[in-house]
Amino acid sequence: MRRLIPVLVAGLLASCAGPRSLEVKQFVLRDTGADYGEDAMVRSEKLRRLHGAIGVKEQAERLGQYYTVLWKDDSQGPVRVIFEYQQGGSGSLIKREVRDFDPTAISGQADFSVVGENFRNKGRVLAWRISLVRNGEEIASKRSYLWQ
């Protein structure tokens, strides 16, 4: 019993930890068919990404990779989320997308996507890095394994 108490205390303390300052969720939309044998969460995400695309051509334009960035920072000042990535067909070229947020915001969500012609011509994203910058200072960053 005495050995169990420290484990329970450690578990309670770990569950009280605040949310991470930067979280990245990735989704790859490979096809437009609604396969009901898939996991319900995957099928739901696929349908969400295809919502509003009526024709086959519109649906094909949405095939690609999606990145959802959730961030939280309690300080004040201009906020910028930067998405840098390299694609298979673009060699060592690093592409960059930026989302700016209100200086009073303490949390937010930024959505990035590599879809359509960009995805078809340049290929899939091989390496990426996402940075959270506030007041010109990098607060947090996440990167893929292949990012250098």
Enumerate the language-model features and the residues they cover.
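Sec-dependent bacterial lipoprotein signal peptides
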Residues: M1-C16
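Contiguous beta-strand segments within globular domains
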Residues: A40-D73, Q109-V114
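A short beta-turn/strand-edge loop motif at beta-sheet boundaries
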Residues: Q59, D73-V79, N121-G123
